[in-house]
């Protein structure tokens, strides 16, 4: 890894109707699957800033925004395995927005096609959507919710990219900030920030549920988890 090629500082204030101020706060950055653009999810500004990546000169150029709803606090963006769809998780609204992604005249185009909730309406005041991942096959998207401490599984419709709920599981932990799906797609982990642990769950897609399995692993104030295959030399 070399030195820093470029740096961008987000400025301004988020839109607020409540007694709070939103300041720039980037929670997630992801390259588009074609690696032409960088998406910076700004939790405080209620938007995803899209930068063109100039690899030759090591520069980022702001060229577009995906504007979220007022006081929505976007938290994460993920792309479908075929690269045609983007999924944005909103922390304060407890929703996932689905976008069709394409490139036209060398410009990124994001077209919203679906909005779906991560929790029942009766829980919206005590819920904060926190984590989101897509399974290795691209067939399923999982979200975790803090406050109500739950995990939701959606099936991804192959032709449209749209989401259909499969099951919701109340997890035995506090603040499942992130989650990770096993490569076999039969299990997932929740990374729990407040209870300082990692729990494992077994999935039954046919009957629509998941069950806690094994013993938790204690970790002090965990924030992030990913599963990677280690290559043995």
What residue ranges belong to the model's regions?
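Asp-box/WD-like beta-propeller blade repeats and closely related beta-sheet repeat scaffolds
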Residues: 1-28
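Short loop/turn segments immediately following beta-strands, especially the blade-tip
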Residues: 1-3, 51-59, 99-109, 154-161, ...
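Surface loop/turn motifs at the tips and blade-to-blade linkers of beta-strand repeat domains
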Residues: 10, 19-23, 66-70, 121-124, ...
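Beta-rich catalytic cores
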Residues: 25, 73, 128, 147, ...
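Residue-level detector of Asp-centered blade-edge/turn motifs that repeat once per structural unit
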Residues: 33-34, 81-83, 136-137, 183-185, ...
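Short loop/turn segments immediately following the C-termini of beta-strands
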Residues: 43-44, 53, 91-92, 101, ...
């Amino acid at each position: 890894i070399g030195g820093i090629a470029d740096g961008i500082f987000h400025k301004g204030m988020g839109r607020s109707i409540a007694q709070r101020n939103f300041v720039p706060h980037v929670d997630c950055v992801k390259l588009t699957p074609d690696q032409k653009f960088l998406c910076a999810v700004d939790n405080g500004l209620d938007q995803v800033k899209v930068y063109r990546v100039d690899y030759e000169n090591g520069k980022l150029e702001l060229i577009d925004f995906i504007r979220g709803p007022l006081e929505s606090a976007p938290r994460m963006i993920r792309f479908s395995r075929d690269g045609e769809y983007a999924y944005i998780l909103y922390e304060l609204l407890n929703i996932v927005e689905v976008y069709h992604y394409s490139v036209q005249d060398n410009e990124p185009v994001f077209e919203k096609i679906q909005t779906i909730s991560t929790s029942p309406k009766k829980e919206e005041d005590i819920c904060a959507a926190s984590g989101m991942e897509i399974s290795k096959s691209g067939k399923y998207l999982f979200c975790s919710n803090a406050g109500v401490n739950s995990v939701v599984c959606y099936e991804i419709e192959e032709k449209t990219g749209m989401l259909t709920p499969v099951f919701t599981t109340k997890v035995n932990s506090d603040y499942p900030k992130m989650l990770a799906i096993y490569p076999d797609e039969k299990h997932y982990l929740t990374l729990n920030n407040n209870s300082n642990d990692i729990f494992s769950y077994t999935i039954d897609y046919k009957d629509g549920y998941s069950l806690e399995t094994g013993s938790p692993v204690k970790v002090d104030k965990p924030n992030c988890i990913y599963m990677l295959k280690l290559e043995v030399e």
